[in-house]
């Protein structure tokens, strides 16, 4: 059976076995360079994210993009929030925070928007947003790009969230760095499924 991913790979048809192999080989790319996905490619990537598992169709997520000069502004924000959290931070730590957004040509910040629901607890809504984030990484890879999911203290800092426009009922799921892989994919040891799967 062949499947087509027209928005992700411009109409290339792949077999289901090739698709499965792609999923089995995906890995994170800590070193990213330009270009980032185009506007058209991002549309396809975001559409993949919108198909995340979503109990009761709450759609408990939204996405914030940071690209171009806004990365530098975001780095300055991260530095300011670091100093607020840790006034004794040295210059190396401050520089690391300031330069973090410059490690890729763009960032996507998945946000979970929590709501009260009798059948969908907050944790399940967070899971849904995390699935959307994972779908972005997979779709970016399918589009010929790469990415890495990072968190760190900034992801849990309410000052960072407020500065990004999050409400009290919203949280950052992570920072997705997207771009073109710089170099060859790193070698990852093959895991044995028997170490992770059991029968009851």
Task: Name what the model sees in each region.
Residues 69-73, 79-80, 114-116, 158, ...:
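Short, charged/polar surface micro-motifs in flexible loops or helix N-caps
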Residues 49, 108, 114-163:
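Small-aliphatic-rich amphipathic alpha-helix that forms the alpha element of a beta-alpha
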Residues 103-109:
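A structural motif
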Residues 5-103, 200:
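N-terminal amphipathic, basic helical "cap/leader" segment at the start of enzyme domains
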Residues 160-173:
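Short, electropositive alpha-helical surface patch
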Residues 15-22, 172-200:
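C-terminal helix-cap and adjacent tail motif
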């Amino acid at each position: 059976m062949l499947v087509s991913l027209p928005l992700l790979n411009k109409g290339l048809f792949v077999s289901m076995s090739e698709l499965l192999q792609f999923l089995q080989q995906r890995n994170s790319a800590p070193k990213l360079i330009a270009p980032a996905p185009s506007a058209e490619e991002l549309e396809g990537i975001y559409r993949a994210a919108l198909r995340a598992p979503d109990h009761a169709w709450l759609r408990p997520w939204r996405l914030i993009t940071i690209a171009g000069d806004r990365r530098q502004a975001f780095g300055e924000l991260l530095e300011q929030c670091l100093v607020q959290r840790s006034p004794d931070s040295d210059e190396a730590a401050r520089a690391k925070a300031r330069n973090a957004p410059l490690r890729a040509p763009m960032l996507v910040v998945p946000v979970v928007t929590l709501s009260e629901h009798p059948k969908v607890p907050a944790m399940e809504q967070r899971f849904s947003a995390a699935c959307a984030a994972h779908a972005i990484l997979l779709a970016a890879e399918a589009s010929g790009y790469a990415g890495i999911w990072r968190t760190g203290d900034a992801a849990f800092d309410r000052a960072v969230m407020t500065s990004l426009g999050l409400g009290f009922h919203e949280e950052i799921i992570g920072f997705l760095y997207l771009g073109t892989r710089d170099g060859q994919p790193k070698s990852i040891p093959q895991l044995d499924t028997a170490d992770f799967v059991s029968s009851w």
